[in-house]
Curated annotation (Swiss-Prot):
Role description: Catalyzes the reversible formation of acyl-phosphate (acyl-PO(4)) from acyl-[acyl-carrier-protein] (acyl-ACP). This enzyme utilizes acyl-ACP as fatty acyl donor, but not acyl-CoA.
Pathway: Lipid metabolism; phospholipid metabolism
GO BP field: fatty acid biosynthetic process; phospholipid biosynthetic process
Family: Belongs to the PlsX family.
EC number: 2.3.1.274
Protein name (Swiss-Prot/TrEMBL): Phosphate acyltransferase
Sequence ranges of Low complexity compositional bias: 337-354
Subcellular localization: Cytoplasm
KW Lipoprotein (keyword) present: no
Taxonomic classification: Bacteria, Bacillati, Cyanobacteriota, Cyanophyceae, Synechococcales
MF terms in GO: phosphate:acyl-[acyl carrier protein] acyltransferase activity
HAMAP family linked to this entry: PlsX (MF_00019)
């Protein structure tokens, strides 16, 4: 097992990215390909390099503030080279903490879409009251969606829960403003009808915002605009709770004593609500395994992102998606036709990217 890590992407690259990758190599027994400028990586690398750690040179970088399609102008950008490692089967997955839009664009250019997929989706795992995560998708790849896109998200999410999380019959919910089938906008109404009639998934109906973290659903689908807003709100919950407890518990001697007695429990609460534990989000629907983690990721989150990528590769999620989606929804685009040859990746066809979606991708 070998994971390609874009060591140049993220607010704390390359130092924290390398630290997280070294932790993953040590504790997960996984090979790591650190992709980036050798001169930038060198100060943070142990010498000699441990067996299983390699450096793959990439002389260009797509900055956090650059537009997604900057990957076209920078064929030797670290995110492009990372994707090419998977394309050439020199790595089993990619982990990236850089520009989300650029990561998506690089995945489209170098890996292509799976057959039967109109738009790949970013799926994020969130903690729930029942202790098991819920998969929310899309959380930013497609700010505007059609009903068939959400139908495909539901299928991919259900397969992920079966393969990676071991849930035999995942409960799929459609994020909406009410439980009733007749609630919502045109997209929600049309999608509800399609999901009700869709074989192969267990559609459990509409999920209201308050239902997402209860654990009653295993998969919740929505468009990327709503999903990204919900994701960032959910990520703030743990931080807000922790801050309130820090401010209120130490008041007076009783509070200080209670804080000391409750310390193990409070640590457990923080761990359950901490999004760092979930590592990042999977880009589902491209012809390769790609985990997108926060631009603000430090070593711990990079470690968990690599763990997520490793689990997805070990459970053969890509092969399952390739088989299931191609059979269920034939598309004009398939994995063999959609990705440009490696030799021409620096001059891709404009049709290779869904520009209308990527130029507004949410980070």
């Amino acid at each position: 097992m070998r994971i390609a890590v874009d060591a140049m992407g993220g607010d704390y690259a390359p130092e924290e990215i390398i630290k997280g990758a070294l932790l993953a190599h040590r504790y997960l027994q996984v090979g790591i390909a650190l992709v980036g400028r050798p001169d930038a990586l060198e100060p943070f690398l142990p010498r000699p390099l441990p067996p299983g750690i390699t450096v793959v040179p990439a002389e260009e970088v797509v900055g956090m503030a650059e537009e997604p399609l900057a990957v076209r102008r920078k064929p030797q950008a670290s995110i492009n080279v990372s994707m090419q490692q998977v394309r050439a089967k020199q790595a089993d997955a990619v982990v990236a903490a850089g520009n989300t839009g650029a990561t998506m664009a690089a995945a489209y250019l170098n890996l292509g879409r799976l057959a039967g997929i109109d738009r790949p989706a970013i799926g994020a795992l969130l903690p729930t009251l029942k202790g098991k995560p819920v998969l929310l998708l899309d959380v930013g790849a497609n700010v505007d969606c059609r009903p068939r896109f959400l139908e495909q998200f539901a299928r991919m999410g259900s397969l992920y829960c079966q393969c990676v999380l071991g849930i035999e019959k995942p409960r799929v919910g459609l994020l909406n403003i009410g439980e009733e089938p007749n609630k919502g906008n045109d997209l929600a109404l049309a999608t509800h009808q399609r999901l009700t009639q869709l074989p192969g998934i267990h559609f459990a109906g509409n999920a209201e915002g308050r239902d997402v973290l209860t654990g009653d659903f295993d998969v919740v689908v929505c468009d990327g605009f709503v999903g990204n807003a919900l994701l960032k709100f959910a990520e703030s919950v743990g931080q807000v709770i922790t801050q309130v407890l820090r401010e209120e518990l130490p008041r007076g001697w009783r509070g200080k004593l209670g804080c000391w007695l409750l310390q193990p429990n409070l640590k457990q609460v923080k761990r359950r609500m901490d999004y760092v534990e979930y590592g990042g989000a999977l880009l589902l629907g491209v012809n390769g395994i790609c985990v997108i983690t926060h631009g603000s990721s430090k070593a711990a989150m990079v470690y968990h992102a690599i763990r997520l990528a490793k689990e997805a590769a070990e459970q053969k999620i890509l092969q399952r998606l390739q088989a299931e989606m191609a059979d269920s929804h034939p598309s004009k685009v398939n994995a063999g036709e959609n990705a440009p040859p490696l030799a021409s990746a620096s001059n891709p066809s404009p049709e290779a990217l869904p520009v209308g979606s990527l130029d507004r991708v949410e980070g």
